[in-house]
Amino acid sequence: MKLDPKPGTREFDQRVRVMSFYREAELHGARLLLVMHKHLRDPDSQMKLTRHLADEARHAFLWTKRISDMGGTLHNIIDGYQHRLGLRFGVPKDTIDLLALTSVAESRALERYQSHAKQEGVDENTLEVLRAVSGDEKWHLAWVDAKMREIAKDRGDEERANRATERVRAIEREVWATFVAEEAELMRLAT
């Protein structure tokens, strides 16, 4: 069984930094959901948004706890992935844009968590957190995509959901490429 790296080592600091980025993304996602609560007022959406918000807060807690259990200290992340995506995307024009932004960010989170879980040498405690958050992300994607398509259909423009999602994806790919390049450079400098 893989053990946690020793505090003070480069490997330890890198893991804590990555987990701090995950935590920040979950908190940023929770803030976005609070905005959505004001726009989606029907009872079904309110129920799903509240569950989704609870999941995001729990995910942030799981990453906080994992870092603490390792003996680490949270990194203050001020320029994380979701922050960058939000700056680049700008203010969503309507609920469909808000849902598309959420869908694309959730999709990236799921991909990132699944990729991390497949890496060699991931310890069991971190795998446990990765599995827990990945399971929730699948439900988040399903309900957000369904709601976005429902709203587009109700507005008489079913393709609007696809256009909004593709617009966000194009922006997200640019943001992600920059983020990954900077992360690789940080990891290179740390070794």
Segments from the language model and where they lie:
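Non-heme di-metal
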Residues: 1-191
